[in-house]
Amino acid sequence: FTEHNVSRAIWRPPVTATAYVDASRVYGAGWGYELTIPPAQMVPAHGIWTRQELLKSINFLELRAVRKLLQREAPALANHVLLLWEDNQSVMYILNNLVSRSQEMQAELRLIMVLLEKYDILAHARYIRSEENPADYWSRLVDKADWQLRPDLAQRLIHRWGPRTIELFD
């Protein structure tokens, strides 16, 4: 990974995998991606942000969504050339230039770089408008099966009514 980014090649190697990545702070407040490694079918995934993550900037969340893709799919992406479609131009710049002025985002980028290097993935990002990004759907998807009570509310119920005999969505 590093040797490919130290000097710029005149021609890039052909893309062998494509991913659309997105993060959202509205609706489902989560992240999502669509990954295709031909000849396989497209693989979608999504999740919701933690409370701590929701305190972060949308730029950070977009970068974190890329890391979530790599954490889940890096073994399948080993030795591939990955084209990342990103609807955030700042994050696209950060991924392509491997630098950020934000220490927090630079730390997140380092974690991404570790995964890319470990699995020998060559990645580059391109911009796509949000309206055209299929991952936008997954980042806003509300998973109705993934509900839970706030921990403080669950404790209040247990304190008031005693030990539970049924599941409290946890």
For each predicted feature, which ranges?
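Short, flexible loop/turn motifs enriched in small residues
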Residues: 24-31, 78
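A short, polar/acidic, helix/strand-boundary loop motif
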Residues: 36-64, 72, 90-103
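Beta-sheet entry/capping signal
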Residues: 16-18, 30, 41, 80-83, ...
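Short conserved beta-strand segments at catalytic cores or DNA/RNA-binding microdomains
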Residues: 22, 32-41, 86
